[in-house]
A protein has these predicted regions:
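DUTPase catalytic domain/fold
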Residues: 1-148
Length: 148
């Protein structure tokens, strides 16, 4: 699948994929001046990129494992819908214990193209605390209920 994109100026770094089999496309910080993200704080980082996302797809912004593990920087959950045609910004959270500097050209996130299945919710009236919506072997056990 080929996706059209634009750089907002000539200095914006082109997204890269380290290996042909990688799911994500790495994107870079497009900053004039470095910024510092203090522990337990966030910053919105511009990429200088716009993407033409086809109908029936979305871009999901994901962590890069290296900055999450080495620097304590996590990407805030992002879904970029096909109708959005503005610049992509990355919401970075510093969950570590030391300030982190972000500079122009730093790899900050990866974009993954995901097919979207449109759904329409159907409200079921009644006492859902007594009657499950569906019957399954798993049941209604929540976090950690299947072991591990």
């Amino acid at each position: 699948m080929i996706i059209q994109y634009q750089r907002l100026d000539e200095y914006v770094k082109i997204p890269t994929r380290s290996n042909p089999s990688d799911a994500g496309l790495d994107v870079y910080a497009n900053l004039r001046d470095p910024i510092i993200i203090e522990p337990r704080e966030s910053a919105i980082i511009p990429t200088g990129l716009k993407f033409g996302i086809p109908h029936g797809y979305m871009l999901q912004v994901m962590n890069r494992s290296s900055i999450a593990a080495k620097r304590g920087l996590m990407v805030g959950a992002h879904v970029i819908d096909s109708g959005y045609d503005g610049e992509i910004f990355i919401n970075l959270h510093n969950v570590g214990h030391s300030p982190q500097m972000i500079r122009y050209g730093d790899k900050i996130a990866q974009l993954v193209m995901v097919p979207v299945v449109a759904f329409r919710p159907n409200l079921i009236e009644g006492d859902l605390y007594r009657e499950p919506i569906t019957i399954s072997d798993r049941g209604d056990g929540a976090l950690g209920s299947t072991g591990g």
